[in-house]
């Protein structure tokens, strides 16, 4: 979010859970008008303390925000859980105001830890993380770009969260790059 602290923003978070991201926005942008969509009723009730939260499934495409359009729509580790992430992005794009942006955090299945496990014959789901057992879709950097293009969105700023990458991981990535057409090591993070 690049506006000044006093900007009167309209922000919508899809899958807002208990509202932690929306609370961060409110703390940094006190004039922001906050909205959320959350499928879990208990979490929606909590988030409703700081935002106008609609309890429901965004994929049913029946949201009514009273004609309000948004400066930002946030998808924080949500798209990989949806049956139709592209359709949902297209639907939500209709709620953006002119010049509005979608902010998304999407796990990279081409992460060095997943690739290392794959070449050793493992693709083990977990209760959280890159291989969360509730993920329906998996994306690589290139697949994220393709999905955005198909939905008529443009990637303006993409950043990789490089957490817990060891020197051994970096050396492994260098070897992978020698074997592949990938020329940007960040695609493995």
PLM region spans:
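Helix N-terminus capping/helix-initiation residues
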Residues: 1, 57, 180-184
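Conserved SAM-binding loop
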Residues: 2-116, 140-145
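S-adenosyl-L-methionine-dependent methyltransferase catalytic module, highlighting the catalytic core
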Residues: 20, 83-189
């Amino acid at each position: 979010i690049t506006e000044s602290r006093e900007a009167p923003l309209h922000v919508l978070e899809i899958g807002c859970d208990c509202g932690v991201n929306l609370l961060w926005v409110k703390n940094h942008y006190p004039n922001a008008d906050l909205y959320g969509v959350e499928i879990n009723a208990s979490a929606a009730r909590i988030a409703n303390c700081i935002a106008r939260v609609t309890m429901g499934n965004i994929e049913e495409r029946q949201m009514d925000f009273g004609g309000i359009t948004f400066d930002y729509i946030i998808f924080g580790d949500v798209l990989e859980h949806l049956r139709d992430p592209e359709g949902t992005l297209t639907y939500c794009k209709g709620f953006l105001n002119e010049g509005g942006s979608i902010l998304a955090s999407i796990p990279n299945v081409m992460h060095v830890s997943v690739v290392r496990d794959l070449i050793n014959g493992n693709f083990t789901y977990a209760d959280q993380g890159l291989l969360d057992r509730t993920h329906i879709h998996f994306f690589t950097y290139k697949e994220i770009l393709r999905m955005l293009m198909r939905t008529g969105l443009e990637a303006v700023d993409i950043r990789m969260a490089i957490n817990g990458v060891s020197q051994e991981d970096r050396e492994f990535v260098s070897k992978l790059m020698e074997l592949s057409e990938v020329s940007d090591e960040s695609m493995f993070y």
